[in-house]
Curated annotation (Swiss-Prot):
Catalysis: reaction(s): GTP + H2O = GDP + phosphate + H(+)
Keywords: GTP-binding, Hydrolase, Membrane, Mitochondrion, Mitochondrion inner membrane, Nucleotide-binding, Protein biosynthesis, Transit peptide
Classification via HAMAP family: LepA
Membrane topology label: Peripheral membrane protein
Assigned protein family: Belongs to the TRAFAC class translation factor GTPase superfamily. Classic translation factor GTPase family. LepA subfamily.
PROSITE patterns: G_TR_1 (PS00301), G_TR_2 (PS51722)
Presence of the UniProt keyword GTP-binding in the record: yes
Protein name: Translation factor GUF1 homolog, mitochondrial
């Protein structure tokens, strides 16, 4: 009883102390949930909550949807930061540069991988000042700049009516600048040129204006001169967006119809879809259906990205936001799908062109028992990256795995890195390959994405082979033209164009086999041009070529995961490099290991990894020599038996090193 009295007295003292504490402390105790509210956190923007009634004040004519497109490192994400600060969407000095680059891989590599959307509210200077309500709603989409993520750019542009084309004032127009311009041009977007980084000592905005005029027929007077780093000239960007980019089309009184732009998986909320409202209005509680699958859903939550998720309860015509509708499977959220009012007949929106996969690679769990975990991780990640194709496959060497199609080698690397960082998956990748077409003597054709699927000695004779090619655009300083032409010739390239952009820079266009550029072409190009080259490519036609399948054999047994298709002229060199690399990374066994590269039944390269040998004569200090011979013969027979039944473990590092085998020497 005495103990209970002490506890009661202690509790009363604590309560009196809290009662005398500041009001903030008492409010936290009385309303603990408020401490966790995202709307109270300054990192979610200065505006706080946005209501549906506020969004109703923005009809389509007061909405602008625009994207920022540029070459890598020309200042897209920094410009996006400044615009978010200028509109009060995020606080100045938020301490996180490139705010919209949210993935760990983006921050580590310094590149944008995923297109990100942010809604901003902005009062145009020419608008009347009779109300505190912002006059315009601006949806900003920051896009990647690398060629491998052009699919992200094209999907983002589908939700926009205009684009800011950002060009570095010192570097000028680069290869990806050209590619992104034509993506926007073909989408009929209004393009506003922004010459960025004018604060640099080497900036030459007049020269950049001339390049824009010569290459794109853009009036030099239309270019905006800015520095996203210092803020110089930024005050003219948003007024130009409002005045020069049209409002989104759409019918406000029609049944709701929206385009599914992107999606990602949340463990608690399920699939979160990013959508652009084309017609009508979407409200919480509405019933919607998918035009692709026919499945119906109830809208559980709807809102905008400001720049984090902000529930509004409604989205109106022309606005871009998110929808949570109880989708639990990533297969239900098909990028480019049309979501519409349930039990109504609407015409589906055009959607997107399907992604064309340029690089294929096998993906296997480092530990075979982790296959289900890897399958789960890939399913969740492909919800956020719909440009990856996934099919299950089985390898004799590596067990159950997946054959994955990517848009390029960087895309493949980023996908692997995200698997590891976001899901803790440890994977083994096989040698990347491209889709080939083989024609047999009877006229039948087959597309081969996995070299192991092509029999080394098929019953049908191979009559012809085709490989995919690309049109490569290379921009370089004029003094490096010679070495670059030599590099392209070594990679079996055909020159299509050779022009000068200005007195210092040249533009080269080549038709190159895709196989020749997917591994190390860009690194070599950067090396021979001291880092000044820029490179972009677009897929072209298939061309006939002299191709052969090369197998890697360990102790006479082919390793299907290491099979590759090479050009006949380079088979000898590539085979020699492969077996040499394998010899370095395979651990020595108690038996001898022969490593061979073979085309059909013909071995073109070989290395031998000698066996570890136990000193069986250690206890023989003398005596009859026949005793020693008997021990040696017994050891020899044992090693032969081990070689017949022994298995060779191939470390993960060996597969990684095979990716680096050069195609150029």
């Amino acid at each position: 009883m005495a103990g209970a009295a002490v506890l009661r007295r202690s509790a009363r003292r604590i309560y009196r102390h809290l009662a005398a504490a500041p009001a903030f402390s008492r409010s936290v105790l009385q309303q603990p949930k408020r401490l966790l509210s995202s709307q109270s956190s300054p990192e979610h923007g200065a505006r706080g909550a946005v209501s549906g009634s506020e969004l109703a004040l923005y009809p389509p004519e007061r909405v602008r949807n625009f994207s920022i497109i540029a070459h890598v490192d020309h200042g897209k994400s920094t410009l996006a930061d400044r615009l978010l600060e200028l509109t009060g969407t995020i606080q100045k000095g938020h301490g996180q540069p490139q705010y919209l680059d949210k993935l760990q891989v983006e921050r580590e590599r310094g590149i944008t991988v995923k297109a990100q959307t942010a809604t901003m509210f902005y009062r145009h200077v020419s608008a009347s000042q009779d109300s505190d309500t912002p006059k315009y709603l601006l949806n900003l989409i920051d896009t990647p700049g690398h060629v491998d993520f052009s699919y992200e750019v094209s999907r983002s542009l589908a939700a926009c009516q205009g684009a800011l084309l950002v060009v570095d004032a010192a570097q000028g127009v680069q290869a990806q600048t050209i590619a992104n311009f034509y993506l926007a041009f073909e989408s009929n977007l209004s393009i506003i040129p922004v010459i960025n980084k004018i604060d640099q000592p080497t900036a030459d905005p007049d020269n950049v204006k001339d390049q824009l005029k010569r290459l794109f027929d853009i009036d030099p007077s239309e270019a905006l001169l800015t520095s996203a780093k210092t803020g110089q000239g930024l005050e003219q960007v948003l007024p130009a967006v409002i005045e020069r980019i049209p409002s989104p089309p759409g019918k406000c009184d029609a049944p709701v119809r929206m385009l599914l732009l992107d999606s990602y998986y949340d463990e608690y909320k399920g699939v979160i879809c990013h959508v652009a409202i084309v017609d009508g209005a979407l409200r919480k509680g509405d019933k919607i259906a998918s035009a692709a699958t026919g499945r119906a859903y109830e809208v559980l939550d709807v809102g905008i990205m400001h720049p984090e998720l902000k529930p509004t309860g409604v989205l109106y015509t022309g606005q871009v936001g998110y929808v949570i509708s109880g989708m639990r499977s990533t297969k239900e959220a098909r990028i480019g799908d049309t979501l519409h009012q349930a039990k109504s007949t609407v015409e589906p929106l055009p959607g997107f062109k399907p992604a064309k996969h340029m690089v294929f690679s096998g993906l296997y769990p480092a530990d075979g028992s982790d296959f289900e975990a890897l399958s789960h991780a890939i399913e969740k990640l492909t919800c956020n990256d719909a440009s990856v194709s996934i099919t299950k496959e089985t390898s004799n060497a590596l067990g159950m795995g997946f054959r994955c199609g990517f848009l390029g080698l960087l895309h493949m690397d980023v996908f692997h890195q995200r698997l590891e960082q976001e899901y803790g998956a440890q994977v083994i990748s096989t040698i990347p390959t491209v889709p080939y077409i083989f024609e047999y003597g009877d006229g039948s054709k087959v597309q081969v994405e996995n070299p192991a699927a092509l029999a080394s000695n098929p019953g049908k004779r191979v009559a012809a082979c085709w490989e995919p090619t690309v049109i490569a655009t290379i921009i370089i300083p004029s003094e490096y033209v010679g070495p670059v032409i030599m590099l392209c010739s070594e990679r079996r390239g055909e020159q299509l164009e050779y022009t000068f952009i200005d007195a210092q820079r040249a533009l080269l266009k080549y038709q190159l086999p895709l196989k020749e550029i997917i591994v190390d072409f860009y690194n070599e190009l950067k090396g021979i041009t001291s880092g000044y080259a820029t490179f972009d490519y677009e897929d072209s036609e298939y061309q006939q070529s002299d191709l052969v399948k090369m197998d890697i054999l360990l102790n006479g047994q082919p390793v299907d995961a290491m099979a590759t298709i090479v050009h006949n002229q380079k088979a000898q060199r590539v085979g020699k490099e492969l077996v040499e690399k394998l010899k370095k990374f395979i651990e020595r066994q108690m038996f001898e290991i022969t490593i061979q590269a073979a085309i059909g039944s013909k071995v073109i390269a070989r290395e031998t990894l000698s066996a570890m040998r136990k000193n069986v004569l250690a206890k023989c200090y003398g005596g009859d020599i026949t005793r020693k011979k008997k021990l040696l013969e017994k050891q020899k027979e044992g090693k032969k038996r081990m070689k017949r039944v022994g298995s060779v473990d191939i470390p993960q590092e060996a597969f990684h090193e095979l990716l680096k085998v050069s195609n150029s020497k």
